[in-house]
Amino acid sequence: EDEAVLAHAARGSTSAPWIQWPNRAEFDAHFASIQAAIEGGELYQVNATAPVLGRLDGEAFDWFHRLRWGQPGGYAAYIDDGQDQILSMSPELFFHWDGERLLTRPMKGTAPRSADAQEDAAWREGLHTSPKDRAENVMIVDLLRNDLSRLALPHSVRVPALFDVKGWPTVWQMTSDVTAQTRPGQDLADVFTALFPCGSVTGAPKLQAMRHIRAHEPQPRGVYCGAVGVVRPGGAATFNVAIRTATVRDGHWRCGFGSGITAGSTADGEWAEWRQKQVFLDRTREPFDILETLLLRDGQARHGALHLARMERAARHLGYPWQLQRVADAL
């Protein structure tokens, strides 16, 4: 699989300069309207979004592989329906359901990455302990608990993981796990009826936030903030939340970005988060390898475990696909 990614990435595909709505003044006005609604008791949180537009010089399939090479992992998907090409690089799990156990993993809370190890660790710790981001995260956890309760056996809704922070090539993200055992007789349509759209891309209360979004965002979001996934033989289903997802049509692309706005948010902070999330579109880097030098003595690598650990740190920092057993077998 990695070799296929390399082959497509090497072909190359570039995107022309972007057009963004809103500009900063429009964003500030939109932010103020949301905060006014929160202060008026209408809402607790709104996930506000807007599109970035551009022209694609090259093939959508090649661009997808370049994006995927720049940020491996997550829940990526490529769909071509004959008119539109959907390039989803989502890091967020909407749900996984095996017919009995239902897992959701809402993602709320973002911080930038840094090439400096100490600064990078500080950003991670700052996100993990941020009162604003924790409040935003727990609001959506409570919303998902309520949504899951519509499907769940009594007393089966659980939060086994709260405020986990995971590193991606361009950002740190905070997630929590919400699980439930579903009642007998539920099917996939019931799961979507109860959960869709994911609360992490609407806000809370969910219906009121969706009404606010419809009234204030200039156009429908399309596939962005929807769900893309797979249903396996036997019925097990995994779907992402279609964030970091671009739609290409006739050589032009559109990609939405946004953030959750609460009473504790600031316009400067949310604007910076929007800008930081757009960095993933620049992660269309050329393929590269990690070079490690080591000493062989009598056919054995000296300090092999230390070398493997160093290679793994480099791979994870650079977003390079890492399979420990394959590397160890090669040594």
Please provide the spans of the model-predicted regions.
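Extracellular glycan-recognition regions
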Residues: 314-327
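A long amphipathic alpha-helix within ATP-dependent nucleotide-binding catalytic cores
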Residues: 217-218, 326-331
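Extended alpha-helical targeting/anchoring segments
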Residues: 1-298, 305-307, 315-318
